[in-house]
Amino acid sequence: MMTPRLKEIFNKEIQPALKDQFGFKNIYMTPRIEKIVLNMGLGLDASDSKILKSCEEDMAKITGQKPVTTKFKKSVANFKTRKGSIAGLKVTLRKNKMYEFLDRLVNIALPRIKDFRGLSPKGFDKFGNYTFGIKEHIIFPEVSFDRADKVRGLDIIIVIKAINKEHSFALLEKMNFPFIKKGDN
C-alpha cells in the first residue's frame, strides 16, 4: 500500500521544520495529528430509514469507512428526542485514511465552498485540538449533488497531540490549512 502524499510531506518536510521552529530536541516532540472525528447530526430525520441509509452512504464515500450511529443520551420534550433513539452518524479516521481525508479536505473540498474566505483560527481548544463545521457535505467530490436528498452539515474535529495551541496552529498552517489572516475579515 502506498503512503499518502500528505504523510510523506509531513515526515520529510513539516516535522523537521517544526522541530527547528520550536527548538525541540528530537522529532517525537513535534505536534502530530492523532485522529480526525467527523460527525453528522440528523435530528428528526434520523427516524426515517431511507434518509439514514442515504447519509450513511454519503459519509462512507467521504471518509472511506462505514459510520457508526450515535444515540441521544437524554429525552428532551422540546426537541422531540427520546433516549436511545438515533441522533446522527460518526466516523473516526486514523493513520493513512486520516492523511488521505485531510489532503482531500484542504486541496479539493474547502476550495469548492462558495464565498470561502478561510477557516477561523478561533476553533482551537486549550489542548490544541481544532474543531470546525462545514454547512454543506456536498463540497466533497465523492458525493453526488443530484443524489443528495438534503444538504447536511458536518462537524470535523482534528485531535492533535501538541504542547499548546500555538504548536497545533503551526502544524495545520504548514499543512496548508486556509486560515483567515489577522487583517482579513
For the regions a protein language model found, what residue spans apply to each?
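Ribosome-associated RNA-binding proteins
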Residues: 1-185
